Amino acid sequence: MFVTILRSTTLLQLKPKLGYNKYLTRLRTVSLAGAVTLAASAYYCYECFWNTSMEFIHHPEAIEKHVLSIFADIKYRPTFYIPHRLMQLAYATRWEKKLDTEFERQLFKLSDGGQLALDWKNKHVVTNKPLILITHGLTGGSETNYIKHAAETLAEAGYQVVCFNQRGVSNCELLTSRYHFHGCTNDLREVINYLQENKQKGQQIFGLGFSIGGSLLLKYAGEEGYKCMVNRIFSVANPYDLLDCSHNIMKLRNKIYDWSITCNFKMLLKQHQSSLAENEKTKGIQIQEALKAKNTYEFDELITRRLFDFDSPEQLYSNIGCGNYIKDVKVPVFIMHSKDDPIVPQFLVPYDQIKQNPNIIVALTNKGAHVEWFTGLKPQRWIMNPILRYFEEIQSL
């Protein structure tokens, strides 16, 4: 805006040197640019500092509609110098300080001979609070900052916390040639059954899922129905239809996210290359070609869909999401979305299905990107504010 004002001043000085018509044309152009800049600045300030309340979507007779009052004073204001979703991603990737969180690791043996890592906080604490099971997104497990921040915040509040890492994730050795598949709930079910048998007497299990990890929890809850052993779920940036999400992420404006996810896929593949090698003969996977993949679709064509016997990536994606299980969820679920989420944009959230299930409530913020939600002059992750408030207050209502 200041540049526009300076240009206007310069135009006044140039008036004698320009013809009258050229001068008016130039003045109109600069004035229009100034007006657009002023309007954009006003909209930016409105979105960041005034339009900060959460919006809620739910069934008219939602079972937990009474809990919405606990969020009345919780507002999200993004860090003013990184309000855009790309800026938040860049900050999380390049500049956010890595948390030095210490977990107690348990190597959990699966029924097929495989293993995965359960990372605990407060494992041996005696508490009357629920056990919180955290499930991660596509780009990493308990080594990621958003999982560490969640675990630390909940542990400081006195909760037992266990982070579920998919097979091969978070530096956990593969004991079989089977890889993780975010659409299969079998491993998660085995872990939940174990937690149910070994938790403290009378203790409930709450689920906290991020991105595809939230979808996995909801799919499990839908499959189990009334038998679900997770008593309550909070899902963050939950994808519902991975086929639609795949089409969205391949768009030019979202290529940076697709590239980031692909890099993580290739890093994990390289780490477990020797364990997966036998699948080149038995399943037809192409490891060396996949390590050169330019996007997630290429990677899934060469590796994932072949490992799990799907005919195409499209068929694979159609079997991952929780969208078809929303109607069968029988436990209370609270889902948090940002309206500027590039991975799960608003038009991919199945509001009509959600409104038909009285067990589900969706909360929306205007900003926040995918799982970032940075706030404050020195950016801090905001998302644990509503999560902790929900878990704390729901026990006293």
Q: Predicted regions span which residues?
A:
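Alpha/beta-hydrolase-fold enzymes
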Residues: 12-14, 31-66, 197, 201-308
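N-terminal cap/lid segment of alpha/beta-hydrolase-fold proteins
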Residues: 12-15, 78-127, 374-377
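Short beta-strand/loop motif that positions the catalytic acidic residue
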Residues: 329, 335-337, 341
